[in-house]
Amino acid sequence: RDTDRSRGLGDVYKRQEEFNITEKINQLPDNKSIKLENVCFTYDGADRDYVLDNVTLEIPQNKVTAIVGASGSGKTTIIKLLLGFYSPLKGNIKIQDVSLDDINPHLWRARLGAVLQDSFIFSDTIANNIAIGEESIDKKRLLQAVEIANIREFIESLPLKYNTKIGMEGNGISQGQKQRLLIARAVYKNPEYLFFDEATNSLDANNERAILDNLMNFYVGKTVVVVAHRLSTVQNADHIIVLDRGKIAEQGTHKQLISLKRSYYTLIKNQLELGM
């Protein structure tokens, strides 16, 4: 496992700045682009062995940005920094020109949806797992969410349908069904930002293809970051960033990166054994 995959969601509650909420900015900038400026990070706080080493990149608003790289290259760490679970050891993360550390974390989390490798399924009904925290569930949004996540047929085949109780960590459902429920949860929220970390890696090819096609329409007008290794998940992204041992190796579109025949080309070639 990547070292950056082993940190749980509970880490978010340890952030010191959450004790200073009243001093935080309560409005996001009009420009929703995200900038990482000379970001260095390591989990143990030491000034060495950076998981991210002087990373500078821009995630443009209303576009799909994919992040790829070998295991341990720092992909998941970028997602956790974007979520506000941690702050950079050096450098800055900005929304337009506002530091993410200066934005109210409750506001920030309200505006984003995420599917992570350690996202949680609660001991509750399917409907309540999708529409988290909603006193009154919007049935139209619920149906849209399960359609996009390609899980409506499965749910409606169950005797209690959306009122079916599922257990902690998704007991009683497969890993693929869990991922589809988590995608439905993110879609139901209808956020301005979407962060997906290997959100479809447990799905078979047919389910993944259907969901990715559905998501392309849902992504319109949203700022999206997708961490993935499957070619099918990233090739249609507006921009692809290739990480190698915590540094940016190259970036561009799928077509541009394939033509360069460097890091991305090698990743894809090795994965698919195309012999290109």
Task: Give, region by region, the residue ranges found by the protein language model.
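ABC-type nucleotide-binding domain
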Residues: 16, 25-276
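Active-site phosphate-binding and catalytic loops of NTP-dependent enzymes
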Residues: 19
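Single conserved hydrophobic/aromatic residue that forms the stacking wall/gate
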Residues: 2-13
